[in-house]
Amino acid sequence: MTSSERTGFGPYLALTRLLCPLVPLALRWRLRKGKEMPGRWREKLGEASVSRPDGPLIWMHAVGLGEALALRALVAALEARRPELNILVTTGTRGSAEALAKNGIGGAIHQFLPMDCPKARAQFLDHWHPDFAVWSEQDIWPGLVHAAAERGIPQVWINARMNRAARDRRMRQARLYRAVYGCFQTISAQDDDTTRQIAAFGVTAQVDGSLKPAAQPLADNAQERDALTAAIGERRVWLAASSHPQDEAVALDALTHLAAPGLLVIAPRYPQRGDEIVADARARGLRVAQRSSGERPDAQTQVYVADTLGEMGLWYRLAEAALIGGTNDDIEGHNPWEAAALDCAILHGPRVANFATDYAVLDAGGAARQVMDGAALAAALDDPLLSCQTGRASVLVQRGRDLVDALASQLLTRMDA
């Protein structure tokens, strides 16, 4: 690390030293609120809950649920090439830990990322002493990057994503982020726009595309799927996936336009909204069953509110098509590739800024379709050509898996250098 890079980190490191005494208090408050896992919250203080295995170890970090699930294909590709390699995956959220426990992440170890303060950083790196570090997407902690660089640990940034607004925010601390990005041996970006934004910090990125198309299929319970299939009968099933209120309004409106409504499954992004969704659907005169109450759909059920966690793999397998949530309001979209991986046709509203490149690729390839309102959603669901979308999406998924295979080879070459 150059002297100018060390200088760039200075103010940030000083601030983390000052704030460090507050970290345990903040974590205990979050624990009381149910935002931390009772048996594992001290991992965020750098206290490992499992032993480090012998042998070389790659440390990979992704902040949340979607980002962590996107790493599963890369972990599988690395393990296929180097079975003896140990992989540590860190995340920051309780939801991501629960999703990885439900869906698996190969033979990798999961831990929570330590808070970015001196003692936690040191304890984490002392215990795990990784041979190589991989940062994914946007959650990059300057103090940890600095600490790893000081120990001579090679670091790369993959699946990098940065729009102009994010660049402008970071430019307010330009010296810090020039130092951070200068510590990476390689920066692998999702798209050309990201490379342009990163270039403003004096570093170069290569375009390899997004990891999300290669995401492994979400898990489900085959026995439960069979039971639900028997309960539903021959009716078609369609889904409002990871939905928010405006998505649900569009989906419920579509029921009045469909030639054969079938069964609408609403799987809200936040399951605690289940009672609210049930009340709204019943106010429209619809017959509703609620999963969190132990109810199953029957031949008369029009709406099934799937207000539970960790079952999206089940709903995507049951449904022939999904309206992806967050695409009808200022949420600006959720990940469409989970549906693609399970041959569920993708429909979405106009608000997709969080996954703009992904939806553009899917739409251009005839693998997804934009719908503006309930009538348009119903027309898409009634279109006999809707099923053609899944085959086109499968082609794009395979391209993503080829990308991941190439990236895994690049990372191992970097690690061995």
Where do the model's predicted regions map?
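Acidic donor-binding loop of glycosyltransferase active sites
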Residues: W128-F132, T301-I331
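Conserved catalytic-core segment of nucleotide-activated headgroup transferases in glycan assembly
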Residues: G66-R81, A219-G294
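Catalytic binding pocket for nucleotide-activated donors in carbohydrate/polymer assembly enzymes
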Residues: A200, R317-T390, S394-L396
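Structural alpha-helical scaffold elements that stabilize or flank donor/cofactor-binding regions
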Residues: F124-D126, V180, A231, W315, ...
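Nucleotide-activated donor-binding/catalytic signature segment of Leloir-type glycosyltransferases, i.e.
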Residues: L100, G104-F112, V278-D307
